[in-house]
Structure formats: structure tokens, C-alpha cells
């Protein structure tokens, strides 16, 4: 048993009313090693136990079984655990080497389904850096979800319906050509889309024409549908190339169009419950009874065309009926917050008790030199261009550091793409951040390549040793390894916390912390010294490679064997 498990077990014995998962999630590292190895804060227990946090901490220390620890002390509102170094080192290394990548797995989810609405680019537009966050956050959350015992279902809710397709069809019919589109489909369609908006600024009647074409598409017009199908097929080809580079797959590509024949059911349900109200010719749901600050949810426009809300309601109902999800996550930018608050409110009014299981996983913006990207204006940074540039930067550094490395191009792709993904996930999900590719692909500092390089370095030590590592000789007495041991020991708690907070940055920051601890040890230790501690040191190195590789996997980043 690793000592975090010992701590959780010991705490749960004196706090039987607190769920084990909640206890595990509260564990943290003290600000100073003088305060112990693991801290348990008691602030949030004050209301439940009706005691001051300091008193709760003191009572826990007086009642807890301390036999598995060096000592347990109360420091203000914290219970601080000082671990038995020898016992903890042995237990941690043996467990990691025995379990391998399964270390940190738990069954909190008991196999329940979690749908994850993610990526969801718009058809007929290239994937830009604006799509990166939803794509990689969703993928990492899916991996973290599975690690916590749930069954993730990744849904790419393609933006393949809406008035923009009416605008695009109008633009193509008015000034586009088939030859142009076939020569360079996505770039040409984007140019048409931007040109439409520029012309519509001068002549507003273009917007009416675009809406009219979309209404024809909704009504099943053959020409409109053929063009839409063509635009969709060309877009999916390019999207698939990007997803393949990021090694991201999906369980469903059911986009907005998939729900065309499923919206009437939702509208009928709203009507049956007398929730639909006519307002200036449109049909809305008044949400003021749930929250007086909420604006009404628009269900149908004055021309009878459906809106995003109608589709999202139909999608939510379909997903519950199809997957019976325990949680339904929507990885969508923070600017859509009100939309999801409205959607959950409508679902509640419809009588669905699972409305609270719908979660908006909001995230902040990526800017380039402080500027937000916009497809309508055309100042868009293409994701494939960023990945290409990241590959080239990674390859340049690899050629400088290790010119004899085999298959440099493959490693450069893993490092370049990994750098872009890691940088995104390293940032707290709801934060905005500016993107600088040169900093992102550096092999030093808080970067993905730094973690990958640390992992490759550790693997190279094991190759040099060229000996099997035994799990029976793990008597480390080197105090320099303690920082690594305690960091390794945190991994199961980190995995749980990342799921509970829906926050992949917890894993990324953990990987950086473990990398720093290992590199400090590497710089000051003779790991391959042939003495009676050699096996134990190699076991430590192997444990580091197991956990770094698994941390990178959870983030959706490759772990090259060599760099």
C-alpha cells in the first residue's frame, strides 16, 4: 500500500461520514517540507462537523492510527503527515513497478458513460487554432475519465448546419466556380465566406439571400443539399488529417444536421408542457421562474427556422436516451456560458431530472500577439500551419542535440505536436493565454518537450544499465530520492483531482513537477554506480518513466523513446 492510500484509509476511519474520494481529493503537498510530506486541510469540514478547523485537525491527530507514519501533527487547520521514508519508498516503487501504467487507476465511475462534446469544427472552414482547446481538452478529459473508471464517449458535434451554409451556397452560386473549389476546397470555401461578409456590410440584402438558401436547405431542396454534402465531405477529409496528426479519434461524428428529424419531438414536448410562448412571431421558453436574470430561450425564429438551442436540446435528449450518461460534458468556450445555463434551465422545465448532469466545460481564449482570431474577418491562424511550424522547430533542435538520432522526422512530429497540446493543457482551463510557438517548443522550462526529454533521458539510463530491475531489492536510503518518491506517490490523488475538477492542467503541472524532481536527482547522483543500491535506483528511474509516460498519455502527448 502506498502511503497516500494509508493516509486516506486512516483518515476515513476517523471521518466515516466523508466520502473516500473527497478525502483523496483534499490531500495536498505542504508549502514546506518542514511541515511534512502530505497535508489534509480541514476548512471545508467546519460546517459539517460544526467545529473550528483548528479543533477538527487536533481531534483527527488525537484519534488517528499513526503506526504507518513517522508522525502526524496538527498545524493550525492542517493535519500534516510525515511519512516513513524507507517504508514509503519500498511500497511506492513496488506498487508502480508491479502495476505499471495501471498505477493510479480507480473505479470511481463504475463503468458509467460520460459523453464528451468536443472539437466540433464548422464544415467548410479550416480548423484553426481556435479549435485546438476544445479538441485537446476534450481528449485529455476523455483519457482522465477512463482512468477514473468511467466509459468516455467522444462526440464531434460538427457544425454542419445553420445559416452560414445558406450564405456559403449563395456565395458559391453567385461568384464561385466548381474548378476553384476542387483545386483547393477549404481555402476556397473560406475565401467565399469572408467575401460574403465583406459584401454584406455594404449590401444587407445578401444576408436575406443567405437565410433564404438555408431555408431551402432545411426544406430539402435537392441542389442545396448536394452542395452541402459536397462541402461537408471535403471538410471532413481535412479535419481527419489534423485528428490523425494529434492521434485523436471519436466515437461519433453526429453533427447538427443529424438532429434535423429529432427537433420536432422536442418542440412537441415543450408545447405539451405549455412551455412555448410566442414573442414577436418567434417561439421562446420563458426562464424567469428559474432565474429572473436569464433571457428567454429562442426555439424557433419568425420564419419558422430552428435555432442552435432547439438542436442542442434534441441532442441532449438523444444522448441521454442512447448512452444513458452519468455526466454529459460540453467542452465549449466560456463565451457560450449563458447558452448552456439556458439549455439546462429548459431541460429542467421539461422535467428531466438529469439536467444537472449536463456540464459546460468552459475554457478561455488563445490569442496571438494579443489578438483574438475571427473566421469572418479572415485573420485566422490555421492549426495545420502551427503543427507544421512546430514540427520544423522541433526537428531543428533535435538535429542540434542528437544528429545521429534515427527517424528524426517522426520524433519531431511527436515533439512538435506534443508541445502544442501540452502548452494548451498546462494552462488552467478557464484562463486566457497568448501563444508563442518558439517558447512552446523549447526543450527547457515549463514545456511538453522538457517532460518528453526527461522521460527519454530516464529510458536511456535503463538501456545503458541493460539489466532487469527487481521489485524485491528496493531499500533506498538516499535522501536525494525522497522528493521523487513523494511526487510519484501523489499520482493516484492527482488523477482523481483532475477528474473532479475537470482540469487537465493538474496532470500537466504534475508531470512538470516530477520532471524537475528527477532532473535535479540526475544532476547530483551517480545512478549507474555498481553498488548495493543500484537496483533500487534503477527501480526509481523505471517508476519515473512509467508515470511520466502515463501522464503524457493522459494528456494526449506521445512519449518518444529517444530524443
From Swiss-Prot:
Its EC number is 6.1.1.19. It comes from the Bacteria. The keyword Ligase applies. Keywords: Aminoacyl-tRNA synthetase, ATP-binding, Cytoplasm, Ligase, Nucleotide-binding, Protein biosynthesis. It catalyses: tRNA(Arg) + L-arginine + ATP = L-arginyl-tRNA(Arg) + AMP + diphosphate. The keyword Nucleotide-binding applies. GO terms for biological process: arginyl-tRNA aminoacylation. Its main location: cytoplasm. GO terms for molecular function: arginine-tRNA ligase activity; ATP binding. A motif ('HIGH' region) lies at residues 121-131. InterPro entries: Arg-tRNA-ligase (IPR001278), Arg-tRNA-synth_N (IPR005148), Arg-tRNA-synth_N_sf (IPR036695), ArgRS_core (IPR035684), DALR_anticod-bd (IPR008909), Rossmann-like_a/b/a_fold (IPR014729), tRNAsynth_Ia_anticodon-bd (IPR009080). One of its GO terms (cellular component) is cytoplasm. It is found in: Cytoplasm. Monomer. Belongs to the class-I aminoacyl-tRNA synthetase family. This is Arginine--tRNA ligase.
Amino acid at each position: 500500500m502506498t502511503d497516500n492510500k494509508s493516509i486516506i484509509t486512516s483518515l476515513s476511519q476517523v471521518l466515516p461520514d466523508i466520502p473516500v474520494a473527497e478525502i483523496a481529493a483534499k490531500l495536498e503537498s505542504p508549502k514546506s517540507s518542514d511541515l511534512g510530506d502530505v497535508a489534509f486541510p480541514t476548512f471545508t469540514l467546519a460546517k459539517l462537523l460544526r467545529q473550528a478547523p483548528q479543533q477538527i485537525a487536533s481531534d483527527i491527530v488525537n484519534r488517528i492510527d499513526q503506526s504507518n507514519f513517522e508522525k502526524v501533527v496538527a498545524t493550525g487547520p492542517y493535519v500534516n503527515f510525515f511519512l516513513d521514508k524507507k517504508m514509503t519508498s519500498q511500497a511506492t516503487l513496488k506498487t508502480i513497478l508491479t502495476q505499471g501504467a495501471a498505477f493510479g487507476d480507480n473505479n470511481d465511475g463504475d463503468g458509467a458513460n460520460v459523453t464528451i462534446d468536443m472539437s466540433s469544427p464548422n464544415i467548410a472552414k479550416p480548423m484553426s487554432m481556435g479549435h485546438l482547446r476544445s479538441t485537446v481538452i476534450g481528449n485529455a478529459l476523455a483519457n482522465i475519465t477512463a482512468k477514473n473508471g468511467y466509459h468516455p464517449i467522444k462526440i464531434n458535434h460538427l457544425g454542419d448546419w445553420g445559416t452560414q451554409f445558406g450564405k456559403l451556397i449563395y456565395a458559391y452560386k453567385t461568384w464561385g466556380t466548381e474548378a476553384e473549389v476542387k483545386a483547393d476546397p477549404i481555402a476556397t470555401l473560406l475565401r467565399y465566406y469572408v467575401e460574403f461578409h465583406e459584401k454584406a456590410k455594404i449590401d444587407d440584402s445578401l444576408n436575406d439571400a443567405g437565410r433564404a438558401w438555408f431555408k431551402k436547405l432545411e426544406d430539402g431542396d435537392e441542389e442545396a443539399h448536394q452542395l452541402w454534402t459536397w462541402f461537408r465531405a471535403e471538410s471532413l477529409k481535412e479535419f481527419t488529417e489534423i485528428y490523425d496528426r494529434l492521434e485523436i479519434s471519436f466515437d461519433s461524428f453526429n453533427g447538427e444536421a443529424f438532429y434535423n428529424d429529432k427537433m420536432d419531438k422536442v418542440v412537441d414536448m415543450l408545447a405539451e408542457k405549455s412551455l412555448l410562448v410566442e414573442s414577436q412571431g418567434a417561439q421562446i421558453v420563458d426562464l424567469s421562474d428559474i432565474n429572473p436574470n436569464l433571457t428567454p430561450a429562442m426555439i424557433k425564429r419568425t420564419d419558422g427556422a430552428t435555432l442552435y438551442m432547439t438542436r442542442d436540446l434534441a441532442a441532449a435528449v438523444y444522448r441521454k436516451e442512447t448512452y444513458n450518461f452519468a455526466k454529459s460534458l460540453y467542452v465549449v468556450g466560456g463565451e457560450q456560458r449563458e447558452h448552456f445555463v439556458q439549455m439546462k434551465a429548459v431541460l429542467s422545465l421539461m422535467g428531466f431530472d438529469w439536467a444537472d448532469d449536463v456540464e459546460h466545460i468552459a475554457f478561455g481564449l488563445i490569442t496571438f500577439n494579443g489578438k483574438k482570431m475571427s473566421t469572418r474577418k479572415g485573420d485566422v491562424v490555421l492549426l495545420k500551419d502551427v503543427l507544421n511550424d512546430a514540427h520544423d522547430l522541433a526537428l531543428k533542435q533535435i538535429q542540434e542535440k542528437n544528429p545521429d538520432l534515427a527517424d528524426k522526422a517522426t520524433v519531431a512530429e511527436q515533439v512538435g505536436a506534443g508541445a502544442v497540446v501540452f502548452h494548451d493543457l498546462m494552462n488552467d482551463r478557464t484562463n486566457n493565454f497568448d501563444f508563442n510557438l518558439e517558447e512552446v517548443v523549447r526543450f527547457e522550462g515549463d514545456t511538453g518537450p522538457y517532460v518528453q526529454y526527461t522521460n527519454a533521458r530516464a529510458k536511456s539510463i535503463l538501456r545503458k544499465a541493460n539489466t532487469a530491475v527487481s521489485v524485491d531489492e528496493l531499500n533506498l536510503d538516499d535522501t536525494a530520492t525522497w522528493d521523487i518518491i513523494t511526487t510519484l506517490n501523489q499520482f493516484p490523488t492527482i488523477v482523481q483531482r483532475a477528474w473532479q475538477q475537470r482540469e487537465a492542467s493538474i496532470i500537466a503541472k504534475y508531470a512538470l513537477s516530477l520532471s524537475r524532481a528527477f532532473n535535479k536527482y540526475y544532476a547530483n547522483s551517480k545512478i549507474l554506480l555498481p553498488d548495493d543500491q543500484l537496483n533500487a535506483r534503477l527501480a526509481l528511474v523505471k517508476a519515473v518513466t512509467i508515470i511520466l509516460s502515463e501522464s503524457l498519455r493522459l494528456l494526449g502527448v506521445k512519449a518518444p523513446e529517444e530524443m
